[in-house]
Amino acid sequence: MKKITIAFDVDGTLIQTGATSEWDMIPNRRILRLLEALASFKNVTIVVWSGGGKEWADTAVKMLDIGHLVKATYSKNLKGRDESGAYIFEPDIKPDIAIDDIHACNLGFLNLIVNEK
């Protein structure tokens, strides 16, 4: 059985964009339901990552009470932007599926872009 790793982004994906602390995080319930459903599959591993760093991903997992569903958290290692303005990330892992709000992302082998904006 092939294991599938699915990475969920924090800002603009699991929570609405604009939070500056754990106290103003507004959950995106639709995406959280998706995470919960995918976590129920035997061969799926859920990870959460953020361009804001591993600590921000850890905070989101705690505040959203999804720690029991998440195997690990990571930083997406934001390095800056390229000449077109697109974000440059150098994450430590390449998941099978990356679920994100950034349209110009190529973070996973398959990239699903949420429609939250």
What are the residue ranges of the model-derived segments?
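Alpha-helical substrate-recognition element adjacent to the catalytic core
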Residues: 1-79
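C-terminal cap/substrate-recognition subdomain and adjoining C-terminal extension
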Residues: 54-117
